[in-house]
Design a protein with these regions (language model features):
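Short catalytic/signature loops enriched in Gly
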Residues: 182-267
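Helix-to-loop junction immediately C-terminal to a conserved catalytic motif
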Residues: 5
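Conserved ABC transporter NBD signature motif
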Residues: 13-21, 33
């Protein structure tokens, strides 16, 4: 997520957004492009400046990008954004430490929406929140997506959230993309052994239905110094000598369903 926004410089490859390679943009071009690309951070406690009020935090991108220079108009925009994310106007001059996690994350969402972006990278946006608040934030984000035509890149380890939220799912293991498909297709036909193990861990809310849990064994390969071959080979129950020596490529096994696994060849 941070590489897409170039908060961390990618070491190789391309990041194509709106037909343009983000990696080739200079500082000034990137500054303009970031109006269309925003980020909602994982931790609502660490991502907000404790020295600034709610209004100052939400107004900051508008000031930095010089989108609204008139202070009164900027404050009107802040109030509008607060209303959109469900924050009461009376909170406008409060500080982050005076608010709970749910309200803090709403501030982060309002800040991300300030410049009317096309894309928002959501880095585990509910994982640090109480379970009772998670659903509220997810429903808010879904409503905003429908109202504003937003595109989310939603990074999470919670597969129940993914099933509820995503149109398309990309599964990664140690930095490698191993399976990608529309949400319904991936949940119905998980193909990569790691994806199958992930989905087997989701509880089934039924006494009649049971799902066999796949327990992975073996040591996790170092992501810094990975061994040759497939990065999942050390834990895969179906791994062959080829898996341990040759890295599989991501390929399409059926329309819109991509898998990086030697075992899918010929399917």
């Amino acid at each position: 997520g941070r590489s897409i926004l170039r908060l961390i410089e990618p070491t190789s490859g391309e990041v194509i957004f709106d037909g343009e390679d983000v990696c080739k943009k200079n500082k000034n071009e990137l500054r303009l492009l970031r109006r269309d690309m925003q980020l909602i951070f994982q931790d609502p406690y660490a991502s907000l400046d404790p020295r600034k009020t709610v209004s100052e935090i939400i107004a900051e991108p508008l000031k930095l990008q010089k989108l609204i220079t008139d202070p009164k108009a900027r404050m009107d925009r802040v109030r509008e954004l607060m209303q959109v994310v469900g924050l009461a106007d009376r909170l406008i001059n409060t500080y982050p430490h005076e608010l709970d996690g749910g309200r803090r994350q709403r501030i982060g969402i309002a800040r991300a929406l300030a410049m009317k972006p096309k894309l928002i990278v959501c880095d585990e946006p509910v994982s640090a929140l109480d379970v009772s608040i998670q659903a509220q934030i997810l429903n808010l984000m879904q409503d905003l997506q429908e109202q504003m035509g937003l595109t989310y890149i939603f990074i999470t380890h919670d597969l129940s959230v993914v099933n509820h939220f995503a149109d398309d799912i990309a599964v990664m293991y140690l930095g490698q993309l191993i399976e990608k498909a529309p949400s319904e297709l991936l949940f119905d036909k998980p193909t990569h052994p790691y994806t199958q193990a992930l989905l087997s861990a989701i509880p089934v809310p039924s006494l009649k239905k049971k799902r066999e849990r796949i327990i992975l064994k073996g040591e996790i390969t170092s992501p810094i110094n990975p061994k040759p071959g497939c990065r999942f080979a050390a834990r895969c129950p179906y791994a062959t000598d080829r898996c341990r020596s040759e890295e599989p490529v991501l390929r399409e096994i059926e329309p819109n369903h991509f898998v990086a696994c030697h075992l899918t060849e010929g399917k």
